[in-house]
């Protein structure tokens, strides 16, 4: 071992060891495991001689038990981690695209205790060899020779097995200055010893793992098997003369009857229960010569205190009632002396155990002897006691170090967590001596196509659809939801008569206004609960269908608050929501009567908070209807206003879905055909109204297609801004879309590179190329890179003008003063819309504000720039 007597010599040794460790860090797992095996075998072969040296040098402990500890440190630790990977790639998750690569921390400085010198050295050397770290050990001055012998034994075995020379060494002549320099110079400090030494390790300025003193309280419950408990405690507390820091320090017996049984059992198992006079004698000895008692046998301690005990006495039991720093029996005693307390109740016993840990040894170890069936009492103890090792019906000395009588990992360094001022809350393992590098490969977000289980379309399909759905779902009670206008004008009568012919009992709910509110949904839920249907049928435009979706979801998930449901999300799979996972109980069929939002096919809904007047855009997969019916016969009598507004809303959703970051080949078809249908047929339907049934069918299809595209891609800026504009200034949603769409299209093309989206996990798609493909699909010709976009933009503007939508907000009579007063709040709500994030070009809040101003003033608006 290194003859280091000066700081300079220590510094030179550390430099040598770092070079050796760099070589060691290149070793393969096979080479490392071979060295570990050799070290463990050498330690086992020399376990007896090392134990003899430890007892002789320290004058502490019991030879046979030290032999066992040496054997344990080598055999149990080697076996536990024999197949544990510590080199190269140690873990791979192909699904997540994650690799974990192990790297050694470098040079470890180990501070060793006088209580377990050789076994602690073997344990820490094995862990460092397993993790390809170099280790420089600093022994306790009273155990330096036996520690150096243990280190030399392990080092020679490691070198013979191929380890680089110099990766294991020991300071043969320890001194405080050298130990402090060591702690300040290594990459990681492993400190085992007294509280002062552990605190010094944490104050060194280097990463440290400390294993400090304990003060293990053990509760004996009335339901415990007293004989088994006492036999276990005696064997644990007398092991190596009580030198293990995890050994029992105080027994708390619950109830006077239990205390008497405990005393009798201790006497049977070679314990001596001290009377009050003997307790005073021993208390005085602890006050004056506690250090001399460490690791001594019970008979020696009794004789030193002037107490007569039988020769076979293994353990001294001192009765006490006080828990304080002035009571020596309430503190840690590294010798076969145990304190006995009486608690009147289990709750008092818990209080006493907490006080003992707070006094000394918080975070270390605690024990409980109890009937395993007393689950409530065990749970209460588990929750209240602040200890990292909670042992039930187990000897704490052997149980805490692991693998002997518990499933804990084998260790001779026991972390106490933050309760004990340690960064380690558990037993020291190889993983704590590794720097694990995580390699994360880029992943594409898994996408799914969400649409109703069945979509019925073509004119006159309603009857056939409902009959087919009845055969599948066998429904007998229908909650029929529509708006007041449709019910009053008897638009729903044909469907209700059909339900009557099918023999279905139904109730009609139509207490809805054009702007759906939270209060209306809550009233509808009350009606749902009263009728308890087999099926919900929603018929109408966006308001009625959104109401049906929200009522069903809130009826089946009453635990979900509106605040949670409307909360914004970045990823719909990771949203923060308190909903319990359960299967939907009630099918929902939607029948569209307008060609606009495509609500019949989407898991989206808009509801207004009547208190603030702000609309909430809600998205949830469980809002998706079970089946959708798109029957153009229900749309024959749409007036011009609903026709143009629905058409422009459809065009906006389809176009933005095609450009969305979440667009895929699956959704492109929906979006492209929807755009083409609107551009080709909206004007015909608008001009000829009921006369052009073919155009009506195309618009009905376009609306549903746009809805399915939007449900899976999330439309972007225009939809977000239109929702806010409609809410603040009471413009129809389609009108808002018609005003905003051309302006936002131009903005996006101009700022594609400047305003990048945050969702980098989606493949880049050139906005200009997408517009070119869209223009070509809609028959707007080919040309230069910008020409197709210009043609598409011109087509949208011309369509807007021909269906008589004004190009500015101001043209609709919105007062300038009111618009400017509400602009900032409206801008914030629009930008905060959940769909804004999925736009290919996400405008900032200031840009959204400017876009609103351009759309209010039109071409006359000029941006005010600072001089």
Mark where each language-model region is.
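N-terminal Rossmann-like NAD(P)+-binding subdomain of aldehyde/semialdehyde dehydrogenases
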Residues: 1-99, 127, 268
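ALDH superfamily catalytic-core signature
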Residues: 4-6, 122, 198-324, 351
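Gly/Pro-rich interdomain helix-loop hinge
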Residues: 728, 735-821, 861-862
């Amino acid at each position: 071992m290194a003859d280091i007597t000066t700081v300079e010599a220590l510094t030179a040794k550390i430099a040598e060891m770092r070079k050796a460790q760099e070589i060691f860090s290149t070793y393969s797992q096979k080479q490392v495991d071979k060295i570990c095996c050799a070290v463990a075998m050498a330690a086992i072969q020399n376990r007896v001689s090392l134990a003899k040296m430890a007892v002789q040098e320290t004058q502490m402990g019991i030879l046979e038990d030290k032999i066992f500890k040496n054997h344990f440190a080598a055999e149990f630790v080697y076996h536990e981690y024999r197949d544990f990977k510590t080199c190269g790639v140690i873990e791979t998750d192909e699904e997540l695209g994650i690799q974990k690569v192990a790297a050694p921390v470098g040079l470890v400085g180990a501070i060793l205790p006088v209580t377990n010198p050789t076994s602690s050295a073997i344990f820490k050397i094995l862990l460092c060899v397993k993790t390809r770290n170099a280790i420089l050990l600093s022994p306790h001055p009273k155990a330096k020779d036996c520690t150096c012998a243990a280190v030399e034994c392990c080092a020679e075995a490691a070198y013979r097995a191929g380890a680089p020379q110099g990766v294991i060494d020991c300071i043969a002549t320890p001194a405080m200055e050298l130990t402090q320099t060591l702690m300040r110079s290594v990459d990681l400090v492993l400190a085992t010893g007294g509280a002062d030494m552990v605190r010094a390790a944490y104050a060194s300025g280097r990463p440290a793992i400390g294993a400090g003193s304990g003060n293990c309280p053990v509760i004996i419950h009335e339901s415990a098997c007293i004989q088994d408990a006492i036999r276990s405690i005696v064997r644990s507390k007398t092991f190596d003369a009580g030198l293990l820091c995890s050994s029992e320090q105080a027994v708390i017996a619950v109830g006077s009857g239990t205390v008497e049984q405990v005393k009798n059992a201790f006497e049977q198992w070679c314990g001596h229960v001290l009377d009050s006079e003997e307790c005073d004698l021993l208390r005085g000895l602890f006050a004056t010569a506690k250090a001399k008692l460490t690791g001594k046998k019970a008979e020696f301690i009794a004789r030193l205190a002037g107490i007569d005990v039988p020769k076979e006495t293994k353990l001294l039991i001192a009765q006490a009632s006080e828990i304080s720093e002035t009571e020596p029996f309430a503190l840690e005693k590294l010798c076969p002396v145990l304190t006995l307390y009486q608690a009147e109740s289990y709750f008092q016993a818990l209080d006493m155990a907490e006080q003992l840990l707070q006094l000394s040894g918080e975070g270390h170890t605690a024990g409980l002897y109890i009937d395993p069936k007393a689950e409530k009492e065990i749970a209460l103890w588990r929750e209240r006691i602040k200890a990292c090792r909670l042992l039930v019906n187990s000897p704490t000395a052997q149980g805490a170090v692991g693998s002997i009588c518990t499933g804990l990992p084998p260790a001779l360094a026991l972390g106490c967590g933050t309760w004990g001022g340690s960064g380690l809350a558990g037993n020291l393992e190889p993983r704590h001596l590794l720097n694990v590098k995580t390699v994360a490969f880029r992943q594409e977000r898994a996408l799914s196509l969400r649409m109703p289980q069945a979509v019925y379309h073509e004119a006159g399909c309603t009857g056939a659809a409902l009959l087919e759905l009845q055969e599948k779902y066998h429904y007998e009670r229908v909650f029929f939801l529509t708006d007041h206008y449709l019910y009053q004008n008897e638009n729903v009568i044909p469907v209700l008569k059909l339900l009557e012919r099918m023999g279905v009992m139904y109730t009609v709910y139509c207490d809805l206004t054009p702007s759906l509110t939270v209060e209306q949904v809550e009233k509808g839920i009350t009606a749902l609960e009263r009728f308890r249907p087999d099926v919900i049928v929603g018929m109408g435009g966006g308001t009625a269908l959104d109401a049906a979706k929200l009522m069903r979801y809130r009826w089946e998930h009453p635990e979900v608050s509106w605040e949670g449901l409307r909360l914004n999300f970045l990823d719909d799979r990771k949203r923060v929501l308190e909903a319990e996972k359960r299967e939907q109980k009630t099918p929902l069929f939607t029948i569209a009567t307008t060609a606009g939002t495509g609500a019949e096919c989407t898991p989206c809904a808009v509801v207004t908070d009547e208190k603030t007047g702000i609309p909430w855009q809600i998205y949830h997969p469980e809002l998706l209807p079970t089946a959708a019916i798109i029957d153009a016969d229900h749309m024959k009598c749409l007036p011009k206003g609903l026709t143009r507004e629905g058409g422009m809303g459809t065009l906006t959703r389809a176009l933005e879905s095609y450009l969305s970051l979440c667009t895929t080949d699956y959704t492109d078809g929906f979006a492209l055909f929807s755009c083409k249908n609107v551009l080709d047929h909206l004007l015909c339907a608008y001009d000829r109204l009921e006369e052009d049934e073919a155009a009506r069918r195309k618009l009905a299809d376009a609306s549903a297609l746009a809805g399915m595209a939007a449900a899976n891609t999330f439309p972007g800026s225009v939809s977000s801004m239109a929702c806010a504009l409609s809410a603040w200034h009471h413009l129809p949603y389609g009108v808002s879309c018609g005003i905003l769409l051309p302006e936002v299209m131009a903005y996006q093309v101009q700022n594609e590179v400047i305003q990048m989206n945050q969702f980098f996990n989606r493949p880049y798609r050139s906005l200009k190329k997408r517009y070119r493909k869209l223009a070509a699909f809609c028959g707007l010709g080919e040309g230069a890179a910008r020409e197709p976009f210009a043609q598409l933009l011109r087509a949208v503007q011309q369509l807007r003008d021909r269906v008589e939508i004004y190009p500015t907000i101001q043209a609709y009579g919105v007062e300038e003063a009111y618009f400017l007063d509400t602009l900032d709040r409206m801008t914030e709500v629009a930008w905060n819309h959940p769909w804004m994030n999925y736009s290919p070009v996400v405008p900032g809040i200031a840009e959204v504000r400017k876009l609103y101003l351009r759309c209010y003033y039109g071409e006359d608006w000029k941006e005010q720039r600072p001089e």
